[in-house]
Regions:
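N-terminal nicking endonuclease/strand-transfer module with a His-rich metal-binding environment
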Residues: 1-164
Length: 164
């Protein structure tokens, strides 16, 4: 079996700001106890330490470019990617997760990849901003996007000689 994946739309929690929700989500995935003191955290077009704030800046830019506020529906997306126990090192898993995020977002959305080693199976959490880097649009979660993530993950696993 190749890596199992899941695509999850992240929404704003009631009683919390979008910024606070983003901070909670990024803090969880970057937890030093789960990522060997942050050793297995990488990012694209943002700093992992300030990703929540940088995501918010892009959302504000969207408001300015489009002359309207974003609906408070999906604030970010999370991809979970789990590997069979003993199949991959945390460093390799982080590289595979980064490649999955880069290819899925086509480099148009900032993201953070955190590889967790606190369970028997190594797994990645990828959070990418729902707003494009240039502030022009939001990610469109198409009908088969979860299947597209799984197929792309399978392809990357095969390219990296991981088991089928």
């Amino acid at each position: 079996m190749l890596a199992a994946t899941r695509l999850i739309a992240l929404h704003k929690n009631k009683g919390m700001t979008v910024a606070a929700c983003l901070k909670n989500r990024t803090d969880y995935i970057e937890n030093p106890d789960k990522t060997e003191q942050g050793q297995f955290v990488s990012s694209y077009a943002c700093s992992a330490l300030t990703a929540d704030e940088e995501f918010m800046l892009t959302k504000r830019q969207y408001d300015l470019v489009n002359g309207r506020r974003q609906k408070s529906d999906v604030i970010a997306y999370q991809i979970r990617q789990s590997f069979r126990p003993g199949e991959i090192t945390a460093e390799e898993a982080n590289k595979v997760g980064y490649e999955l995020a880069m290819r899925f977002t086509k480099g148009k959305y900032a993201f953070v990849v955190a590889t967790h080693t606190d369970r028997q199976h190594i797994h990645n959490h990828v959070i990418f901003n729902s707003t494009a880097l240039d502030g022009s649009r939001k990610f469109r979660d198409f009908f088969f996007s979860a299947l597209a993530v799984q197929r792309l993950s399978d392809l990357i696993c095969l390219e990296n000689q991981l088991s089928i």
